[in-house]
């Protein structure tokens, strides 16, 4: 499990301490953290806890939400997120860029994202942090992510040394141009996240993620394409699913490890 990372959202009800302890028990060497539970535990305490446990922090989630016409408060929050990522000794801040603002101006929202990333990239570079733009499935364009394809994320990322992209299986698997865009991304792939797309889709599509192997995504093929770029970073398992959230943390972590070994690791 050297490259397996447990994204904290997979065991959403767990505290930071419980998530770290679970990783250690199951021999998982890396964890993807979220800002809210980190704040609950305390930033410095979390950094020490993770370091003392010998874990890497594969990413911090999340910055972003930059699409408001007046996004000054969001920019300030993202500056704090960059500082938090540096304090946690991760070089990857996942950016969920935000949905369409109230004016329904999708073109304008995308431009505001590009402008904000240009501004934040300077501070990210100085902190040694990569802003990892996460393209999101088009179903989330209205409320979460106006960048729907890897190509759109790369159009912004390629302009800045400190900006990369996230390849999240759930968000990109459907894209007919995906293979070419993964090749294009190359060393700009800052994070690789896996889960599966469940059908039928639940009423809250956000919670439609399953364990690798339970859905419709060819994760072996996708993983081989990502690995072919030379990506050698951690592979996060990130699952939003009400039943998995309600389950015992230890059972979930054990199942994550089993699925990673069976489905993802052989393709790396």
Where are these regions (language model features)?
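Histidine-acidic metal/acid-base catalytic patches
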Residues: 1-27, 51-53, 83-84, 89-90, ...
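Generic recognition of cysteine residues
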Residues: 23, 58-61, 141, 195
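Structural motif corresponding to the early beta-alpha repeats
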Residues: 29, 33-115, 121, 125-126, ...
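Surface-exposed cleft-lining segments at the edges of enzyme active sites
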Residues: 98-110, 137-144, 209-210
């Amino acid at each position: 499990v050297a490259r397996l990372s447990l994204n904290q959202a997979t065991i959403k009800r767990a505290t930071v301490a419980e998530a770290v302890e679970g990783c250690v028990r199951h021999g998982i060497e890396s964890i993807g953290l979220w800002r809210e539970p980190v704040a609950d535990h305390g930033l410095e305490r979390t950094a020490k806890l993770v370091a003392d446990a010998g874990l890497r922090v594969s990413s911090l989630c999340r910055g972003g939400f930059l699409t408001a016409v007046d996004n000054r408060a969001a920019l300030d929050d993202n500056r704090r997120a960059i500082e938090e990522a540096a304090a946690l000794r991760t070089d990857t801040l996942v950016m969920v860029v935000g949905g369409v603002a109230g004016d329904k101006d999708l073109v304008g929202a995308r431009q505001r994202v590009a402008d904000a990333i240009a501004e934040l990239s300077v501070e990210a570079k100085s902190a040694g942090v990569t802003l990892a733009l996460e393209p999101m499935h088009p179903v989330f364009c209205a409320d979460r992510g106006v960048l729907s394809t890897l190509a759109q994320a790369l159009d912004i990322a390629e302009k800045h040394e400190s900006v990369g992209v996230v390849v999240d299986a759930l968000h990109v698997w459907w894209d007919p141009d995906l293979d070419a865009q993964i090749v294009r991304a190359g060393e700009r792939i800052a994070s690789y996240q896996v889960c599966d797309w469940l059908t039928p889709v639940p009423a809250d599509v956000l919670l439609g993620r399953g364990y690798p192997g339970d859905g419709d995504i060819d994760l072996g093929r996708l993983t081989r394409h990502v690995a072919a770029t030379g990506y050698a970073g951690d592979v996060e398992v990130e699952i939003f699913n009400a039943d998995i959230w309600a389950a015992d943390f230890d059972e979930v972590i054990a199942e994550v490890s089993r699925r990673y070994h069976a489905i993802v690791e052989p393709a790396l």
